[in-house]
Design a protein with these regions (language model features):
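Flexible, solvent-exposed loop/hinge segments and secondary-structure transition points
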Residues: 23-673
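Bacterial N-terminal signal peptides that target proteins for export
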Residues: 1-8
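C-terminal motif of bacterial Sec signal peptides marking the signal peptidase cleavage site
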Residues: 15-18
Length: 673
């Protein structure tokens, strides 16, 4: 069922008939827009980075506290990491809730890791600060400025957080992206910045204390701060109580702060205003304009900190987004004429993902078909009214990825000024749809190494294990089909898989049982969602401990199939496929692709509102199908996941926004397709 966005997702699940569109079936925009403009080239200089660090240090000193501060450019190159105080004083625990003794109440995923401890005398304050800085940069663009407080608001089990009987946050699950194990993300350990997007050690952060940085209205990077010792989240990010991390980061961003016109407070989702910051100028204990110069900082206060694989220890200037040196530049060829497309390039300015054919022995997508899929999706994006961009009336800005049935990337392209996070996520989304729509998903999950969960505290390191194959039986029981995930008969979109990955099913009905791919109550958290993280957690832990200097080798490309020794003495990747090579994603924006009823791939879209992402993927595939004479297209309607009614509630397949186009009053544009 293709739903139009006229009720909250939670109510749509309960009142499905009221959500179904009717009327002009298949109506599409026929107007064409001028090519979108390119972005303004701008970059952080060494002087800029020094100023950010100095202002953050001054605020921390004014509060008689210590902080670790990281600065990144727009594509994630780490330009500086500065630690105040001694390493032993910069302890951090990863947790969403703590008991009276300061230990994590939930165990699993990333929950309960406290460092340094006698059993593991290494630090992660640098990694948490880097993750916050990257989040501020990656979730933002010239048209929207999102902070880690914004992230906290849009990834929780209810939106707005704390309001029960509301659907989950629109970007529920996005925190588990941009991982170091991703076969898409880059890494840099050298002295110079390089092409991005660069990896993030802990994915995206939901802990206030990360802000984007701007110069003359152009997004140039982000700053992240860890001072309070807890890497967590704000359960009520819409309140007016700021955190220590947040106020120091706010001071650090002074003079490079986001323009008010694009800050999250100016943007609404589902009628709810987003939050950018809970602190303001009046909350500062220092005057950033009078902060001592970086060169004047006393060495006893702190120092730059080399971080393996991220920062060499010497401050550097950033790359200018849109320049080939950033890894993301305007298309210079003939692949996307008049569409304003941006493409991903390597250090030699060579395309990383030019259109190519699929790897299947028969029926594979051809290079020409992949190129048409990308072009059609870009056409839809350029006509779509953006949900999260200012000024109002701006077009959506997204990244589009096409994969074959085995998850192999066949082509990627982006709109100008698309938020960087959407690149890795669009590929995650496409792979997730292809994977769960395949005939061997169950066998693949059953063959993965045991998932390791760690609790690291003063008592030592405790390790527990779970087989990812456990989720297969739960899935089959939940949907009432013992052949589920073994026969390839159902086409799963990322919206459908997301429905089944929520801690409540139906989504937003607090107290309802969890979906089969979610952790149950008492063990679920933003740091332990279920299968989504469990397929990648071994690789994530390997990287975190390797970067901290705990003796493990760093990860290789590929987030699944890592066998992590139970004593953390070593790790080995036991498979080499790319099925879920950058992990799994569980919020909307992808659909599988079929040829004569046979799965041949998937298309994923990310970067704007989730209904916009959904529509661009679904409608882009539909329009490509028309252009290709029906050679490939969307799943047959009788095989889509919305034919299933697990536990008496129908799954959703795609949900398209009302009146979605800028130059057309067309309604119900996905109906009947």
């Amino acid at each position: 069922m293709i739903n139009q966005r006229n009720l909250s997702a939670g109510l749509c699940l309960m009142l499905l008939a009221a959500c179904g569109g009717s009327g002009s079936g298949g109506s599409q925009s026929s107007a064409t827009s001028a090519p979108p403009p390119s972005v303004t080239l701008a970059a952080l200089t060494v002087t800029d980075v020094e100023q950010v660090i100095a202002q953050g240090v001054a605020e921390a000193q004014a509060r008689n506290t210590q902080a670790t501060i990281a600065v990144v450019d727009r594509v994630g190159n780490v330009l500086a990491v500065y630690r105040m105080g001694a390493a032993a004083q910069r302890g951090v625990i990863i947790a969403t809730s703590l008991d009276a003794n300061g230990n994590a109440l939930i165990h699993g995923g990333l929950e309960g890791i406290r460092l340094p401890t006698p059993a593991a005398p290494v630090n992660i304050d640098d990694q948490t600060a880097i993750s916050k800085a990257i989040t501020g940069a990656y979730l933002s663009s010239d048209g929207n400025a999102f902070s880690t407080r914004t992230a906290s608001q849009i990834v929780q089990e209810n939106f707005n957080p704390g309001q029960q009987l509301q659907p989950s946050g629109p970007l529920f699950g996005v925190q588990f992206s941009q991982f170091a194990c991703s076969d898409f993300m880059g890494s840099s350990a050298g002295g110079s910045v390089t092409v991005g997007p660069q990896r993030s050690p802990l994915g995206l952060a939901a802990d206030p204390g990360g802000f984007p940085l701007y110069k003359n209205g152009a997004l140039v990077g982000g700053v992240g701060v860890m001072a309070d010792g807890v890497y967590g989240y704000d359960p009520l990010p819409t309140d007016t109580v700021g955190s220590l991390d947040e106020v120091i980061a706010y001071a650090a961003a002074f003079n490079l702060a986001a323009p008010e016109a694009v800050q999250a407070d100016m943007i609404t989702l589902d009628g709810r205003t987003l939050r950018f910051s809970a602190v303001g100028d009046s909350d500062l204990a220092s005057n950033p304009a009078q902060a001592p110069a970086f060169a004047a900082l006393d060495p006893t206060v702190g120092s730059l900190l080399a971080v393996p694989g991220y920062f060499p220890g010497t401050i550097r200037g950033g790359a200018a987004f849109g320049d080939p040196s950033s890894g993301i530049r305007p298309d210079a060829g003939s692949d996307f004429p008049g569409q304003g497309a941006y493409v991903f390039v390597d250090a030699s300015n060579t395309l990383r993902y030019p259109a190519r054919s699929g790897t299947e022995s028969t029926g594979a997508l051809s290079e020409a078909e992949v190129l048409q899929l990308l072009r059609s999706a870009l056409d839809v994006a350029n006509e779509t009214r953006g949900q999260i961009r200012m000024p109002l009336g701006s077009a959506a800005r997204v990244t589009i990825a096409v994969v074959d049935s085995q998850g192999v990337p066949l082509g990627m392209a982006a709109s100008p000024d698309a938020p960087v996070f959407g690149a890795d996520v669009s590929l995650q989304k496409a792979r997730t749809a292809a994977f769960f729509s395949s005939a061997d998903a169950a066998a693949y999950l059953g063959a993965l190494p045991l998932t390791r969960y760690l609790v690291v505290n003063s008592s030592g390191i405790q390790v527990s294990s779970l087989s990812p194959g456990t989720y297969v039986g739960a899935f089959q029981t939940f949907v009432g089909n013992t052949a589920a995930l073994t026969d390839g008969q159902i086409a799963y979109s990322d919206r459908a898989i997301g429905n089944l990955s929520r801690p409540f099913y139906p989504d937003g009905i607090n107290g309802a049982p969890p979906g089969p791919l979610s952790k149950p109550g008492g063990t679920w958290s933003l740091f332990s969602t279920g299968l989504q993280l469990d397929v990648s957690i071994n690789a994530v832990l390997q990287h975190v401990f390797a970067t901290a200097g705990a003796g493990l080798p760093d990860v290789v490309a590929g987030c699944t199939g890592v066998d992590l020794n139970s004593d953390l003495s070593g790790a080995t990747r036991v498979n080499t496929d790319v099925r879920l090579g950058n992990g799994m994603q569980i919020f909307p924006g992808s659909v599988p692709i079929y040829r004569s009823g046979v799965l041949v791939g998937a298309i994923g879209v990310s970067g704007d509102g989730v209904d916009q992402d959904d529509m661009i993927a679904f409608l882009g595939l539909s329009q490509a199908s028309t252009a290709l004479g029906g050679a490939v297209g969307n799943a047959p309607t009788n095989r889509r996941a919305d034919t299933l009614t697990p536990q008496g509630t129908r799954l959703l397949y795609v949900q398209c926004p009302q009146s979605p186009f800028l130059n057309s009053d067309a309604e119900n544009v996905c109906q009947g397709l």
